[in-house]
């Protein structure tokens, strides 16, 4: 009897040890999972989610926009005139509402393809139409889904009132046979905490002319350790939350711009690389940039520079002189 009880006790102890080891193994695995475009801890199902890239209107009448706070990466570039548009790339978080959605340009398609995203837009330029209809990308065009998977907000007028959602994007993808799961190649991120600058720096980016004002400002909050953005003196907020949009990396890159038609549409050289300014932790680093497989990445002395884990905003400008740096107030 005693022998039998001893055997049972040993088996029970063995079972407990094995159970504890299995429980410990799950968190260890989970700790290694990072969102590919933010470098932040996440879940397995998130790492398998295909990115979505949405062309978002940045006309003054379109502000504040919806969904920008959930984008992992936002790329800002000129469309026609001195008005910019955003390419908002979502992967770790998906928007319940995103917009106003605007029309495609060829360079936005190229940038979207760098992440193998589903490309979401409402309308297109002749060049982008030819590009997309030739199979350059999986896309969802608001012209095909206006009134169904895109809706018109009643607080604004066209073309500043077209919106969609991730649920509707998924429905369109299923209708068109696009994959919704994939492994996304990660960006390069810092693996250790970098020291913030003793003196933090802010930056202004002037997309305007003598007749048109389009001034973007990024200000660093030392206490919160992120940047906020403003357009023409008004803080950039997310319409859905009312809160300022925050980011950890600001990357300003110079690329050649050329007017290509009588409507003022542009071609932007995303192949040649050039000069850049990288803002992180209040610091500013003079860099170069390269386009690698459709992605704009910072390079210094021939080596890629890592991003700070978090969200990244990239501003493409015709001339780096559009950026002016100033000391922060140490908030």
Curated annotation (Swiss-Prot):
One of its GO terms (cellular component) is plasma membrane. Keywords: Cell membrane, Lipoprotein, Membrane, Palmitate, Phosphoprotein, Signal. The modification Phosphoserine is found at residue 103. Residues 1-19 form the signal peptide. It is a lipid-anchor. It is found in: Cell membrane. InterPro entries: DUF3048_C, DUF3048_N, YerB-like_sf. Disruption phenotype: No PcrA-related phenotype. A lipid is attached at residue 20 (S-diacylglycerol cysteine). The modification Phosphothreonine is found at residue 97. A lipid is attached at residue 20 (N-palmitoyl cysteine). PROSITE patterns: PROKAR_LIPOPROTEIN (PS51257). Interacts with PcrA. The interaction is not essential for cell viability or repair of UV-induced lesions. This is Putative lipoprotein YerB. It comes from Bacillus subtilis (strain 168).
């Amino acid at each position: 009897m005693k022998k039998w009880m001893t055997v049972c006790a040993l088996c029970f102890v063995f079972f407990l040890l094995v159970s504890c080891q299995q429980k410990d193994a799950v968190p260890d695995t989970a700790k290694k999972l990072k969102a590919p475009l933010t470098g932040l801890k996440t879940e397995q199902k998130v790492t398998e989610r295909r990115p979505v890239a949405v062309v978002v209107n940045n006309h003054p009448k379109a502000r504040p926009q919806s969904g920008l706070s959930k984008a992992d990466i936002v790329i800002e570039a000129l469309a026609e005139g001195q008005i910019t548009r955003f390419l908002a790339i979502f992967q770790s978080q998906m928007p319940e509402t995103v917009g106003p959605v605007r029309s495609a340009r060829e360079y936005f398609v190229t940038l979207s393809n760098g992440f193998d995203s589903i490309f979401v837009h409402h309308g297109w330029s002749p060049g982008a139409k030819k590009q997309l209809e030739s199979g350059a990308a999986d896309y969802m065009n608001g012209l095909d889904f206006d009134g169904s998977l895109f809706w018109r907000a009643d607080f604004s007028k066209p073309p500043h009132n077209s919106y969609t959602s991730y649920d509707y994007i998924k429905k369109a993808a299923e209708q068109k046979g696009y994959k919704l799961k994939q492994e996304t190649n990660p960006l390069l991120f810092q693996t250790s905490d970098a020291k913030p600058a003793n003196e933090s720096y802010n930056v202004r980016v002037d997309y305007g002319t003598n007749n048109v004002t389009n001034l973007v400002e990024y200000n660093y909050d030392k206490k919160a350790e992120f940047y906020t953005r403003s357009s023409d003196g008004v803080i950039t907020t997310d319409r859905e939350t009312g809160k300022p949009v925050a980011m950890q990396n600001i990357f300003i890159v110079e690329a050649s711009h050329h007017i290509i038609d009588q409507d003022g549409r542009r071609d932007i050289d995303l192949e040649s690389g050039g000069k850049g300014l990288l803002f992180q932790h209040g610091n500013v680093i003079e860099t170069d940039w390269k386009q690698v497989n459709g992605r704009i990445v910072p390079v210094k002395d021939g080596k890629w520079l890592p991003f700070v884990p978090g969200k990244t905003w990239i501003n493409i400008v015709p001339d780096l002189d559009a950026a002016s740096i100033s000391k922060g107030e140490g908030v």
